[in-house]
Amino acid sequence: MLSLIVLLEKETLRFSQMVLAWGNGRVGASGGIGIHFPNGELQDISLEFDKGCCTNQRTELYAILYAIQYIDDNFDLNKCKVMIKTDSTYSVNSITKWAEGHSRNDWCKRTGEPIANREFIQEIYEYYQNFNIDFEWVEAHTGQTDSESIANAQADFLANSAAKRAARDKKICRPSSSGSKRNSREFYCEKSSKQVYNTPYRSKSRASINGFPIDDDFEIELVKRRSDN
């Protein structure tokens, strides 16, 4: 039985300008994900987040979805068991606890308001229902020197590389010195009811450059069964 470990990282950079936080949901936030295969079964991924409003939660979900799709493109998910380990309780609960009820309610809350991040959650949930995929919450950033922690650091590097590249390439919006206080703070993402439900980009492109500090950890363990032949 082939055991394939996939480590993911996501990063959302926060910019400071005029004593305002430029990141995590505001215009100018930049993010990236990193996917690392310690045993080299697949090529590592360092990818910018370019799916609209950039927040921690959206980048977390995108990292999970992209990894599942990347594995699906290279392996037969019908013959695989995928374990997704993450320190993001939001991501775990969104799929394993809340998605079932939301799907029956046309992806709306009990109040009738559309759920946030539907474009990621709905597709992840479809994979979760149709394939052998499980989620587990784990503690992150243990600071250990074991092989798994070292591999995790490489995933950190990949994510930070992508986030830094995204920050460099993105035009950052800043208020003018004469702008009103109100305008200078209007850089938050629109509410979930106004989000554009775009489709995550299924790319096979890879890139890697210098890194940055990290945020949340994702680990995916894939067990691929041997051929019956």
From Swiss-Prot:
Say which enzyme class the record assigns: hydrolase
**Which InterPro entries does the UniProt record give?**
RNase_H, RNaseH-like_sf, RNaseH_domain, RNaseH_sf
Q: Which example biological process does GO assign this protein? A: DNA replication, removal of RNA primer
Q: Tell me the residue numbers annotated for binding a divalent metal cation.
A: E60, D87, D156
Q: Which residue stretches, if any, does this entry annotate as coiled coil?
A: none
An example of a Pfam family matching this protein is RNase_H
Reported cofactor(s): a divalent metal cation
All copies of the RNase H type-1 domain together span 42-164
Q: Is Nuclease given among the entry's keywords? A: yes
How the cofactor is bound: the record states: Binds 1 divalent metal ion per subunit. May bind a second metal ion at a regulatory site, or after substrate binding.
Annotated GO MF terms = metal ion binding; nucleic acid binding; RNA-DNA hybrid ribonuclease activity
The protein's name? Probable ribonuclease H
Give the organism's phylogenetic lineage: Viruses, Varidnaviria, Bamfordvirae, Nucleocytoviricota, Megaviricetes
- The gene for this chain is RNH1
